[in-house]
């Protein structure tokens, strides 16, 4: 079918060797040695190959499930501290994917899903832990902000939009999406506004918890490929959320007070009361380790919602030493990232130990945890990153404590080994 035929004008009309369409019926005709293929056939071949890859990839994944020890080791490469939380996450994630790979019940025993609740202050590593797990397992990952969610029918995002975002991450491959991880941040912000059910609708608090119940537990969610409430005529995708791992995280500010009230430590009055001294006071992190489901109910989460998150992990507040480690030790440490940026300019970047301590202290003062470290380093390096591309012969930039405190400019060491201090403009 690839032979040339006259087109009546004295020229030759070319035809696709596969489908027989002429060059005028297709957008593009690609020529080979005595053979032609049109763009439509190329696209069809790509679709066939993609479908075969989809069928093969789940089988290949069977042999790639890391053990809890291996998962923990990967987390250690990117996340400093939080040993207890890492252990809890490694076991929960391993069991979840083991359940998916052995979907057929044995002896009638059907394995339930164990979603995860992470409790810890801002910047303690909740999001990073979830992201790292998804990257290690090579599964689709998406994040949702609980504060933007509302009940269906109200202004805001429907909970089904979470699944739609997950589908977007894997090019609307339903099978792949059903092996994904969803991280819902700020989950504490959808707590019930009062202990007693209100006669008015709480569309962004308890209402969202109710809407999330079925999604987290497992349901067949009908999701439009284009998302949202538009395009009502289009065909919906059916996604089984019982196979998706949901990780919810929040700072739960004030939860420690609820726990202390339950513990009744040093709360009595009178001559026989136990008085709580300074030495008996626990840190917020230590108090959160004692959290019970009843404390979360008191905080404002409904019992049914807590029941869908059986695995609980608490993250401790990061101290100065941990922040210093985060700055320099992980594979993608902030100082290593900026050193790589400077290396592109053929310049070495050095942070002295006293500079790292000063940066950690500044982050502690701001109470932003590890999340605030990048913005601090960005601010310190702003002027030098602005000037460096226009400066010749700089071989090394040194950052010390005085630079972090704003008392001096970075030390520039030139290629001729003569050290100078960059003069402030």
UniProtKB/Swiss-Prot annotation:
Recorded family membership: Belongs to the ClpX chaperone family.
Protein name, entry field: ATP-dependent Clp protease ATP-binding subunit ClpX
Annotated CDD domains: RecA-like_ClpX
Binding of Zn(2+), residues: 16, 19, 38, 41
Sorted UniProt keywords: ATP-binding, Chaperone, Metal-binding, Nucleotide-binding, Zinc
Domain called ClpX-type ZB: residue spans: 4-57
UniProt cross-references to HAMAP family, sorted A to Z: ClpX
Top-level taxon: Bacteria
InterPro entries per UniProt: AAA+_ATPase (IPR003593), ATP-dep_Clp_protease_ClpX (IPR050052), ATPase_AAA_core (IPR003959), Clp_ATPase_C (IPR019489), Clp_protease_ATP-bd_su_ClpX (IPR004487), ClpX_bact (IPR046425), P-loop_NTPase (IPR027417), Znf_CppX_C4 (IPR010603)
